[in-house]
Amino acid sequence: GWRVVAGVNGDYYDTANGIALGSVMSDGVFHNISGSYYALGFYDDGSAVMGKPDLRISAETDYDSFSISAMNYIRQTSFGIFMYDDSFNARGTIGTSEPGYDVICSVRRGELSIGGEMTLEVEDIVEGSVDTAVGRGQYVLSANLNSGENYLNALRALRVGDRITVSVDANSSEWDGVTNLIGALYQLVENGRVCSGLSAGNAPRTAVGLRRDGSLVMYTIDGRQKGLSIGATIQ
């Protein structure tokens, strides 16, 4: 294996629940999927890709297709279909007992990967104020009962035994084949130019840069220690 000589932290997370804001993948397995953040991805050969992949989760059945808002994130009250596996929390549940509509599925073929497909089969359907359990090898598609009718109708059309093809796609094929990925909140530089609209506040910072030759440079700056380190802005 590799001899590790240094490490840096990455992404931001929700301090209330520890969930990363951006997408997370390790050894080819997605732990979170969110389409709205920047990311740093690695291929098996160690090369990297950086940018905003705009990940999209799509579901298709024999008679319908619909979008999934995110995987392993807190279910929103008023919109969206969310997907969960058994790693979302220590209880192995979807994490909420607010009234919802949950479709419990098992994996029949494939796995979630960028540019790939996974086939699910509907095993059970739960409606009500239930913190639905997610077993090993299962996924749950879930929507709050206050969500828009289009989301609820997509789930209510499903029946036990139905097959669902779930795919994850990026805005560029350069993300296909990535096996490790971590999110980032800001892009600092693009094509050698500093991006506009960056925060001016000082704080501890971690940054990663991708050179034109494909090599990486990593920065970590301490902060919030009066008299020792005040951190840095991201401008």
Question: At which residue positions do the language-model features occur?
Answer:
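Gly/Ser/Thr/Pro-rich low-complexity, intrinsically disordered segments
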Residues: G1-Q235
